[in-house]
Amino acid sequence: MAAARPTSVRDLLHDAPRSLRVLSEEHADGWGIALRRNDTWAVKRSTTCAARCESYAGLDQEAVLAIAHIRKKTVGDLSLANTHPFQRGRFVFAHNGTVDTAPLVAATAPEHTASLVGTTDSEKLFMFVLTHVDRVGEVTAGVTAAVRALHALGSIGSASFLFSDGDRLYAHRDNRR
């Protein structure tokens, strides 16, 4: 979610017919949300199903940017380190799908692979995107370069993601298998 002024995330999280709470019954391996307020990210995550988590039930906050995620694990064990969204400084990232990580890691800067905390394909995809942002030196052009590089890799899986630098929200939908 991106808004010009602080906006409630309640509908997205709780009230909509396909809210993350409802969808978490199928995607029950944890949840996370990054809320941008006062030029700072507040990131909350849990390995508990959102529909059964007390701290999730209490979420009704406002933000100008929000990235929320419910996890159905495919790669990486159930742990906070593997729960989205991931944050590195001002950058926040969440991914949906499963990707082959070998080509991603091969094209990722060593300093980013060294900073991996968890074991998911998603965090490796995040480091791939950050590598391109660093190489290009500008966020929008870097995200664009990362998407082009993903397409050049061919069929590596589903690489749909949300990415933010704290000012803008980028969304990429890619369901190639």
Predicted regions, residues:
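Extreme N-terminus nucleophile/cap motif
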Residues: 1-48
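Short, compositionally biased leader-like segments
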Residues: 2-4, 36-68, 125, 129
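Short, basic and Ser/Thr-rich N-terminal targeting/leader segments
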Residues: 27-30, 37, 61-63, 79, ...
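Residue-level signal for inorganic ion chemistry
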Residues: 33, 97, 125
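Cytosolic regulatory regions built on CNB/CRP/Popeye-like sensor folds
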Residues: 38-46, 95, 101-113
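Short acidic (Asp/Glu) patches
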Residues: 46-57, 68-89, 107-111
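Conserved catalytic micro-motifs used in adenylation/nucleotidyl-transfer and phosphoryl/amide-
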Residues: 83-99, 148-177
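Short histidine
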Residues: 100-165
